[in-house]
Amino acid sequence: MDNYSTTTLTMTRNFDVASKRVFDAWLNPEMMRKWFFTLEGTNQVAQNNPQVGGTWEIIDRRDGKDYRAIGEYFEIDPPKKLTFTFKMPQFSELEDTITVELKELEQGCEMTFTQVIHVEQEEDWTESDIEKALVETHDGTEQGWNYMFMGLKELLETGKISYTG
C-alpha cells in the first residue's frame, strides 16, 4: 500500500532489574506470552526464532476472536538493542518498525522504546484528516504499550502479572 503516513512513538521506562532480564523478556516465548500483545490467560500462540531474519508470532484470543501479531528480527545485540517489524495482518499489511534500546543504570536499567507507526489513509483525506489519524493512532498505540510495559515491569520485578486476562 502506497497511501500512508508515519508517526514515531518513543517511550522510556526504568526497571529494577538488569538489562539482560528485560532483553530476554522480549525474546523468550514463555515470558512473551505473559505480556507482549497478549496475556497468559488469553494467549494461544507465542513463538519466535530470535535471530536476524527470524520471525515471531503472537496469537491472542479475546471475546472469541483471534488477534495475530507477527514480525521479523532485523537486529539482535544482547542485552543492548533489538530491532524488529510488527504487523497485525487482519487489520493491515503495513509493517511498523520497533527498536528497543537498553542501558544499564546504577540500579536496574533504562529501556527506550521507539515505534515507527504506519497509518493508512484514504485517497480523499485532507491534511487535517491525516493529522487527526496520526494523532489518534499515536495516542492509542502509546496507551496500549503503556499497559504492556506496566505488565512487563510487574512480571520482571515480582515474577508474575496480577492481571492474566
Give residue spans per PLM region.
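Hydrophobic ligand-binding cavity/cleft-lining segments
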Residues: 1-43
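Glycine-rich portal/gate segments that line the openings of hydrophobic small-molecule binding cavities
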Residues: 43-87
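Short, highly charged C-terminal tails/helix-capping segments
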Residues: 44-45, 151-165
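Beta-strand/loop substructures that line and gate deep hydrophobic ligand-binding cavities in soluble
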Residues: 88-140, 163-164
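A short, structured loop/turn motif at beta-sheet edges
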Residues: 19-20, 49, 74-80, 101-110
